[in-house]
UniProtKB/Swiss-Prot annotation:
Source domain of life: Archaea
SUPFAM superfamilies listed in its UniProt record: Alpha-L RNA-binding motif
Keywords of this entry: Ribonucleoprotein, Ribosomal protein, RNA-binding, rRNA-binding
Organism: Pyrobaculum calidifontis (strain DSM 21063 / JCM 11548 / VA1)
UniProt xrefs under Pfam families: Ribosomal_S4e, RS4NT, S4
Protein known as: Small ribosomal subunit protein eS4
UniProt cross-references to SMART domains, sorted A to Z: S4 (SM00363)
Protein family (similarity comment): Belongs to the eukaryotic ribosomal protein eS4 family.
Record keyword RNA-binding present: yes
């Protein structure tokens, strides 16, 4: 389907539902699903407010003024999602897409020192030729590693990926005591210490608990991402 009715767009998209017609920009096929992404044009126009109209947003994007994860993107429908790094080339402003309790996903300004760093959650692993291990990440990225390195990284772990050097900078295993953020669902944006898990037959549906001070939130394993040990490894708020 080429078009998307505004009434069928994800509820958290910051678009005018009643003004400007019935159609919204539909994200193109890419690293994030429709449910958990924003088209680049919506980011430029409705989130960052660099444009007032879709036409203006398309012009800005077509000029190569927007980078996503260090790559110039000229497709105004390109899907922007969790932990993506968005750079406004003319101004040098850099943002990261992070979970937010109020907005679901929001773009937070980050320092230039973090522009090349992107947390990636491991969604699966595959054995490939030569005994090597291929990791599959939440943004559709894949990375092949030597057997000794690949075996140490498990599904649901997080790696901090260096976008410039295309290499893993830090490995954050999923284990009790780690700091995690809720990435989907009713508790989205909550950051706390991962202190409890109740395993179920379907591992992704296992119930986990995060604690921040006296506050405890519960969600499912599929909805959390490890982001550090005592503090987040990148800025998320």
């Amino acid at each position: 389907m080429v078009h998307l009715r505004k009434s069928l767009a994800p509820y958290w998209w910051p678009i005018p539902r009643k003004a400007g017609g019935v159609w919204a920009v539909r994200p193109s096929t890419g690293p994030h699903s429709l449910e958990y992404s924003l088209p680049l044009a919506v980011v430029v126009r409705d989130v960052l407010r660099y444009a007032k109209t879709l036409r203006e947003a398309r012009y800005i994007i077509s000029r190569g003024y927007i980078k996503v994860d260090g790559v110039v993107r000229k497709d105004y429908k390109f899907p922007i999602g969790l932990m993506d790094v968005v750079e406004i080339v003319p101004t040098g402003e850099i943002y990261r897409v992070v979970p937010d309790e109020a907005k679901y996903y929001d773009l937070k300004p980050i320092p230039s020192s973090e522009a090349a760093l992107k947390p990636l959650r491991v969604e699966g692993k595959t054995a490939v030729s030569g005994g090597r291990i291929q990791l599959h990440f939440h943004d559709g990225r894949n990375l092949i590693l030597p057997p000794d390195v690949g075996r140490q990284i498990k599904t649901f772990d997080t790696v901090v990926y260096d976008l410039e050097n295309k290499a893993i900078k830090t490995h954050l295993p999923l284990r009790l005591g780690q700091l995690a953020v809720v990435t989907h669902g009713g508790n989205i944006g909550f950051v706390g210490q991962f202190f409890e898990v109740v395993w179920t037959l379907k591992r992704r549906q296992s119930v986990v608990a995060l604690r921040k001070g006296e506050e405890v939130r519960r969600t499912i394993l599929d909805y959390i991402m490890v982001i550090g040990t005592e503090a987040p490894v990148v800025k998320i708020s």
